[in-house]
Amino acid sequence: MSILDLIKTRRSIFPEQFNRKEIDDETIDILLESANWAPTHKKTEPWRFKIIRGDSKVRLGEFLARKYKENTVKFSEYKFKKLLKKPMLSSVVLLICMQRDHNESIPEWEEIAAVSMAIQNLWLTATDLNIGGYWSSPSFINKMNEFTKLNSGERCLGIFYLGYYDKKTNERVPGSIKNKVSII
């Protein structure tokens, strides 16, 4: 498959769509290695990943549901239960973190962009391996230091759910690029 075809077939696949097949350690290593090849200004390589498997997924679900309940004005029992189950429906969950350059030699947005490019690499590799993925950034993502230790200058940008899936994904047709480009 060409890189353009791979980009065009990448989709958000949600945990409810995952089957029970486990992603093995070797495959996780391949996904993370692809992320590690993302471009980065001044070679800061700010991406950091925390792998969540097994019983830690239960703990994550409980944490997410509790934080939702604590931080939401319009509480929904449905959403509470969904957050509780989401990690357990996934083969692997990654916390997407960014380690800020301690010298702050480049703007923070560039490091966030580098982490985003690392995720795009990982996501495209997952797509190529028939693994589904979904990046979630709940409103309380800045509370993840209460779930796991983060280093000084490190912060969590999102949660990436991974799993194999069976169903064919829907086709996506983006708006025309002509409406998004101007010539100067």
Protein language model annotation of sequence segments:
Residues 64, 68, 91, 96-102:
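Generic hydrophobic/packing signal
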Residues 54-56, 99-101, 164-167:
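Short loop segments at secondary-structure junctions
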Residues 1-89:
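N-terminal amphipathic, basic helical "cap/leader" segment at the start of enzyme domains
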Residues 44-47, 128, 157:
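Short secondary-structure junction motifs
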